[in-house]
Amino acid sequence: MTFAFIQAEKAHHPVRTLCRALGVSASGFYAWQVRAPSARAIADGVLTERIRQIYGASDGIYGSPNIHAELRDEGTRVGRKRVARLMRVAGLRGVSRRRSFVVTTRRDRAQQPAPDLVQRQFRADHANQLWVADMTYVPTWAGFVFLAIVLDVWSRRIVGWAIGEQMTSQLVLCALNMAIAQRKPKEVIHHSDQGSPYTSLAFGQRCAKLGVRPSMGSVGDAYDNAMAESFFASLECELIDRRSFETKSEARLALFSYIEGWYNPRRRHSALGRISPVNFERSRATNTPFQEPIDIPQPA
């Protein structure tokens, strides 16, 4: 500790003066400076390099909790505080969610919304028990594209999605059709807001035909559809805020890659024990048939 203090203060005071004041030799200090690093320092260096690799593989998204989880799954025994310290020293920071609620809901007062069957209780005991759905927009230099998603509350997996250039009932129907085709639920609650695409006659008829029970929260209250909003918050800070899309095609490809290449198969969730939605489903022994994603026609 004495030599470390001298190292910190030598820019302000002569080394020999500091050594004399602290009762140590200057030669001892200089020998300390060139001494081989400790085993702990070497281990920290090796660990920091692996942390950098994991951080880079996450495209700079992961903070210390998820990087710690990656190391744990690799068999590396290390404390979370040590990971956080090494990331701080290396200048590595994960992204932070700062999404402000943006109202995209446009209610059609001529249509009667479905009752709220969820009442903000976003819990499910198994797959295909409760789905939440919502829409958002993504800016590009050529205008907006709109994304509709269906998320399984049990595993946080995006089971249906669609991208279009208008916020229509056809857009949400495409997302619902994809979810039905992949999951084949026997009985599921589909919870959304009261936006006109969800209260439309076409959407209601499709739900009735498929045996889907529609549920709708209030207008303009993010807490009534908090889980869908949470996904969009992640999408915003991890993709939209970090990219500028020149074309709508570029945005479509980025959204596809984010959902099917990152979020579902790889992105770790604290609510799932720091594993991804796909790995969470694989870790649970169920009789639910989980199929690989299939191609669903997207609206123009």
Regions flagged by a language model, labelled:
Residues M1-A300:
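Charged DNA-binding/catalytic regions of mobile-element recombinases
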